[in-house]
Amino acid sequence: MHILIGGGSGFVGSALTARFRARGDKVTWVSRAPGPDRISWLDVAAGRVPECDVVINLAGEHILNLRRRWNDEYRRDLVRSRVGTTSSLVNALNAMAKPPAVFISTAGKCFYGTAEVAADTRYPELDEYSRPMAMDFPASMVALWEDAANAIDTARIRHVHVRLGIILGAVERVSLLAKLWRIGRGRGILPLIRLPFCLGLGAVMGHGRQPMPWIHIDDVVGLFEHLVDARASRGRYNAVAPGIVSNREFTELLASRLHRPITWAAPASLVRAVVGEDRASILLDGQNVKPRRTLESGYFFRYPELQGALQDLVQITI
């Protein structure tokens, strides 16, 4: 097959590319940077999309890019990098005489919004059939993103929509400067937080009860491969592991894996001051997201529980 990936040079795109090429598929990226086996977003806007079997769109600026200040300009860039690229790609695919068989669009678990939950109340379960709890900025952005993708011609193209949770990738043993350079560069959350944990500075975020819908990068790749090959799959699928944990549980399991203590909790006010109000909601206000349709589709998670995922991804030595 020929697979076109928008945003292929990112964390998820690189992992998907390696997997599809390993099984003999041809992969082309839509990218801002020139290079072999790539086309540009200008090519897409002009309708110069090569004939292909599958299109996967991952493009979008990282919302946790801590090198960017949280302001109106950054919020506009977040929306434009998602909605603009998706609309351009959808328009190009709809205009093709021979369109791809399947279009996989992506968004985030932020679709479900956030809501205040009392200390003695469980967070409501949210699956692919659930409506957003509230429309904060991340939820509004994702709604616009999904609306742009939903303009695809479903009479000719099978549309699969994946909502990604917090992606966990392998932690590489690199220098401190390299770690700092990669902050916000979309390599998953573990490389970002491992250093403070190793220094004994790992912390629970706020009250720590908020759910953290996570997924191992291998399961992200496995699910995309499954949805490409499963021709009956259509509609929304949550890319989150069945074994969801709270922020406190996540923090304690990671600290235990690294043989480090948890000595403090980061106050919500401090988190908001550092990363911005809307961005802080991603860390402080969780969503209890379940992969209902994902499991019903027949996908089998390699890493359904966090402990096994951390054992695979996190080296104990600093």
List each language-model region with its residue ranges.
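Conserved Rossmann-fold NAD(P)-dependent oxidoreductase catalytic core, especially the SDR/UDP-sugar
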Residues: 87-136
